[in-house]
């Protein structure tokens, strides 16, 4: 299979913008998951000055908005997307996803607003001094903020898994119709969130590479990566032990050709092995070059995983 035919073939329905959309949503869900867990395990490190929380403040909602814009404008009729925003169908994975996005964004904004209450009120007093409702809303959030935080964690996990459910619902593609996908995408999303957080910590001058939050992210990163490897193995073993359609899908994806090389060099090599090899360098120096190299490789690997699953998954039709 040539590079051109690898990205353009008859059974292809969803192409590269969907892969980027899945990647961005995973980063948001991963960052929020890590941020909530940091505040639960190390409350003193999860305040408004935390680099992880500040990164989540910008990238958390920003990645979702950018991902949705890519998805909307990629549709054949993007102006009809608003109908999905108000017409829900509990039998449609896409419709349920839109509902999840709406709830996720509302809770995320409220949760972050309370954490960055002092900054928000300072901005409100400077630019909108007559808008007193902001302070009233923040006061109402005080007694329910911990419960809101628990809901935020649940929604972040659901959103991270949803990207996998979206693909696994495509029953006509044996490769994609796999129950492992939601968990795999959740783990890889947390991995990408950790990479973004560590890059932000390395860039931010006030961030201590040996701080509580940096050590927390590093400790979370290791089991998540090993979990990702286990899930990839389980994913392929499940295909190998499946029916004829799943075996054909596995052979088409990993039996040689463009997507086989893409997986072994990009996903496994660059995304998993290279960051592990660079880990001692990162631990020794904790400088920007080391962190950028290791975390950049991890992020590219996660993006390449999304491309691999999406494109290789559509090579074989049941």
Curated annotation (Swiss-Prot):
It comes from the Bacteria. Its main location: membrane. The chain crosses the membrane at residues 18-38, 57-73, 90-112, 150-170, 180-199, 222-242, 258-278, 288-310. One of its GO terms (cellular component) is plasma membrane. InterPro entries: Electron_transfer_protein (IPR052049), NrfD (IPR017566), NrfD-like (IPR005614). Pfam families: NrfD. It is found in: Cell inner membrane. It is a multi-pass membrane protein. Keywords: Cell inner membrane, Cell membrane, Membrane, Transmembrane, Transmembrane helix. Belongs to the NrfD family. NCBIfam families: cyt_nit_nrfD. Probably involved in the transfer of electrons from the quinone pool to the type-c cytochromes. This is Protein NrfD. It comes from Escherichia coli (strain K12).
